[in-house]
Amino acid sequence: MISPGKKRPEMEKFKEIKYAHRGLHDSTRAENSLSAFAKAKEMGFGIELDVRLSKDGELVVFHDNNLTRMAGIEGKVIDFTAEELSKMSLSGTSDGVPTFRQVLDLIDGAVPLIIEIKMSGNECGVAEKLMEVIDGYTGDYVVESFNPKALKIVIKKRPDILRGILSMEYLKEEKHKGSLLYGLLQHLMLNFMVRPDFIAYEKTGYAVWGLRFVRRSFGTALITWTVKSAEEEMEAISHGFDTVIFEGYIPEK
């Protein structure tokens, strides 16, 4: 059950670079914005980003399900068109919500991408749309999701794409305590569904037995998130993670 996919040599190069969490953002560059991605590209860092659908079926780059935190607007991303989202001010900056196509045009293969597929509630079609938009892109990228269902769609449509499962210590959260499903997800026991090429695990979860077992038994590539200092980065590497998704500091390359 816990066995990941067979090691693919294509995964090795993704372990050699560090990834800016939602781009290199700060008070002047909003997270998941073209300006944050442009800065990461300029500095030679890989980029982790999130994709979900707009009202008109466009793939847009945005983390949250709703717009409250980033735009101060009531409502969900899925309730607005891509054009409407592009005109919203994110975190008080001049940045709006970009489409994924715009991001691909901007990056143009310069740095690798980690693309997280967001599926909130009953939303569907995100993975399918990603497979459509990414077709023909020649830059380096991998996809990941907390939801095995999203990765199963990737496997069905594009088994060649490197894929990873996101996980965390779910059972520490009150809402998940005692949950069999989230216990299985925490310990990577649903790996058999998607045979991931890599595991992206939260930085505090290095002692989770499922993660330790995968690391020791299969040598699967391990990425951790979200590292916020050089000290945390050193600690993560010491615990067996191959590379990091970072924010709040500029790591050495």
Enumerate the predicted regions with their spans:
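Phosphate-group recognition and catalysis centered on beta-loop-alpha active-site segments
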Residues: M1-K253
